[in-house]
Amino acid sequence: MARARRVKRDSATNIYRTCKQAGTCPPDVLNKVENTTIADKILQYGSAGVFFGGLGISTGKGTGGTTGYVPLGEGPIRVGGTPTVIRPSLVPDTIGPSDIIPVDTLNPVEPTSSSIVPLTESSGPDLLPGEVETIAEIHPGPVVPSTDTPVTTTSRGASAVLEVAPEPTPPSRVRVSGTQYHNPSFQVITESTPAQGESSLADHILVTSGSGGQTIGGTASDLIELQEFPTRYSFEIDEPTPPRQSSTPLQRIRTALRRRGGLTNRRLVQQVPVEDPLFLSQPSRLVRFQFDNPVFEDEVTQIFEQDLNDFQEPPDRDFLDIRSLGRPQYSETPAGYVRVSRLGQRRTIRTRSGAQIGSQVHFYRDLSSINTEDPIELQLLGQHSGDATIVQGLTESTFVDVNVDENPLAEDFSISAHSDDLLLDEANEDFSGSQLVVGGRRSTSTYTVPRVETTRSASYYTQDIQGYYVSYPEDRDTSKDIIYPMPDLPVVIIHTYDTSGDFYLHPSLTTRRRRKRKYL
């Protein structure tokens, strides 16, 4: 039996819209849309006895209740508190209706009336203000008391003299200010003709005295640093600086880095250091045996053609199967040395079509640095102009007159000081560890001691007796042979010239100790 496929029902809102008018809504859809579920009824009945308005518990949207939400960081809302009203600093004007201006009703214009409107006749109110009343207060000046001036009269016929007292002048304050702009191209003589011994022009004043003068004012001269010229006898040795390869090596460094990055790639190019000095002058002699012109230096890419059937061993094993050798490239190592590089191509594999395949090889050699010698201080040799010295013996020498007849030291010596005791040698010689040789060169007697071959190393014990010297065997005298007691090798070998009495035992007489094994 096949199980029926379950079809998902539409949403409760869409079902409620279509079934509400027909009255065929399912009870779950009706309760959910109209908020009549068991949970909604519990909240409705419980809210009648308990107030949860501030908590925002309801079936509606979350608005925080009637008072809203409290922002974070602020305290709770105080019940019954009055907010503080901020009053403006200026007194606001009262806003009200404007003054009502009455407007007269105009009579209707008759057809027979004139169309000219007189401008002087106006029955409307005057919008401009009327006559303005001006009030001026007059303050009288201070009353100056009158001063009686005495009048002098005389009966004589002379002229009358009137003494008039001057009026007192109030004190006045005068302030003088000046502004000066310096113009270096124009100078104005601000003083009159200078007097004797004084000159004043602009800002430069020169006061002279009996011994000298000093400049006052003006711009002080800049002091420049003077260079001291060294004399012929004092000089400085400059430290050697590393030579610069180029003035602007930016582009060359980038080019060298590109070349170096391609040659030093160990994943694609084989790195082979070369110690043979022929790599710098004649690298072709490292690939094959040939005659090269020592005067000609080839700096182009060299191609070596060789038949694979005719195999030849190269002079250097590192240059085996080299097909081409590139031109020299110069670069700088991290240690600061100059590196000479050549890129080679091997022909290790040959396909049926005739193509030759091989890896790339980077041959390089680092050149040693040329160390600069430490500078030494040189001295002047010979005589130069201005260096001649004239020595005057009469003026620089000192002569002391010595009286030979009078000897002040002769009084301390007695006549016995000139005796033969002064000629005696009081030194003591020590001849310990010395050898005394008497006579000249004499003939010496030489005896040859035969060498005895033993199992041990040969040793000789010689003694120097009565001035004879024993030398080691150089020429053997066959006439003097040692006579053995038996024709075979002796059992015991005794040194005839040895006084210590040592001997050697024949190896056949030594008994060997056998190892005893307890457990077989």
UniProtKB/Swiss-Prot annotation:
The keyword S-adenosyl-L-methionine does not apply. A motif (Nuclear localization signal) lies at residues 1-10, 511-519. Highly phosphorylated. GO terms for molecular function: DNA binding; structural molecule activity. The keyword Phosphoprotein applies. Keywords: Capsid protein, Cytoplasmic inwards viral transport, Disulfide bond, DNA-binding, Host endosome, Host Golgi apparatus, Host nucleus, Host-virus interaction, Late protein, Microtubular inwards viral transport, Phosphoprotein, Viral penetration into host nucleus, Virion, Virus entry into host cell. Disulfide bonds join C19-C25. It is found in: Virion; Host nucleus; Host early endosome; Host Golgi apparatus. Its main location: virion. Interacts with major capsid protein L1. Interacts with E2; this interaction inhibits E2 transcriptional activity but not the DNA replication function E2. Interacts with host GADD45GIP1. Interacts with host HSPA8; this interaction is required for L2 nuclear translocation. Interacts with host importins KPNB2 and KPNB3. Forms a complex with importin alpha2-beta1 heterodimers via interaction with the importin alpha2 adapter. Interacts with host DYNLT1; this interaction is essential for virus intracellular transport during entry. Belongs to the papillomaviridae L2 protein family. This is Minor capsid protein L2. It comes from Human papillomavirus 25.
